[in-house]
């Protein structure tokens, strides 16, 4: 059994194109917003609330890089409000320094994890407590934490997994969406713990992953049944020779495995209801 504490920091998205919005009144008398954000429908909703009218239109234009960093509203409401008040076209664009200050970053995580294995390196169970700093505003702190916990067990086959996650409001800068969506942080902790366990058991990091790798038809610790498209075993086998050769040459080589969701489903129960009326 091995226990360890892990911490990960804020991370900047570093997209090339800073946030920008252009607003004006169109021929229908609506406030029309060209926006470089990743969430046009949310921008429409929030700008409508700001202006107190549903006569608002939003169109994405020249978004450029985002990586999750442009999912939150930054300048769109400012351009819209100024147009609403002045009746003139308005453009609001952040400088690089302003962009770095304003948009949410990757969540800092604080994680305590315990992993147990048998003498052969087969994972018997993992228990974890995870805290994330979502800053002064929630942003996507809830969904990020949900993903972080759902995938923290890794792409491995074992049954005993317990994790508790909490996102906290703090007086720090807001944190939100970023590529990996929380999985990056917990994956780092799980994979590091697995390396520590391999060293304790006396096998290579490759071997402990191969012994525990999920295979089609097996059930992940989060309850998901793995389908035939899963190729973790084949992937590990494909890199084995090069990995071992690099180790033999004393090269600083590492290995890690991870899984991440595609889509937005989180296994919410799919319930149905029917109403029966009995008539004489």
Model regions: which residues?
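Structural alpha/beta core scaffold segments of enzyme domains
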Residues: 1-280
């Amino acid at each position: 059994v091995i226990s360890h504490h892990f911490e990960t920091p804020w991370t900047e998205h570093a997209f090339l194109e800073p946030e920008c919005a252009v607003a004006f009144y169109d021929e229908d008398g609506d406030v029309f917003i060209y926006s470089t954000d990743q969430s046009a429908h949310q921008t429409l909703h929030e700008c409508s609330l700001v202006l107190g009218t549903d006569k608002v239109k939003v169109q994405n234009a020249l978004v450029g890089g985002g990586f999750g960093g442009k999912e939150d509203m930054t300048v769109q409401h400012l351009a819209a409000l100024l147009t609403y008040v002045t009746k003139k076209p308005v453009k609001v664009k952040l400088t690089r320094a302003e962009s770095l200050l304003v948009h949410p970053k990757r969540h800092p995580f604080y994680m305590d994890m315990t992993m147990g294995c048998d003498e052969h390196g087969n994972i018997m169970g993992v228990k974890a407590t995870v805290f994330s700093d979502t800053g002064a505003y929630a942003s996507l702190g809830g969904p990020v934490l949900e993903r972080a916990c759902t995938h923290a067990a890794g792409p491995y086959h074992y049954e005993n997994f317990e994790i508790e996650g909490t996102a906290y409001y703090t007086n720090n800068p807001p944190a939100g969406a970023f590529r990996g969506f929380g999985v990056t942080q917990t994956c780092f902790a799980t994979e590091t713990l697995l390396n520590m366990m391999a060293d304790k058991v006396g096998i290579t990091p490759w071997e402990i992953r191969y012994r525990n790798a999920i295979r089609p038809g097996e059930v992940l610790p989060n309850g998901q049944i793995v389908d035939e498209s899963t190729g973790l075993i084949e992937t590990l086998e494909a890199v084995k020779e090069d990995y071992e050769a690099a180790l033999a040459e004393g090269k600083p080589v590492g290995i890690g495995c991870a899984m991440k969701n595609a889509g937005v489903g989180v296994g919410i129960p799919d319930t149905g209801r029917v109403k029966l009326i009995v008539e004489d």
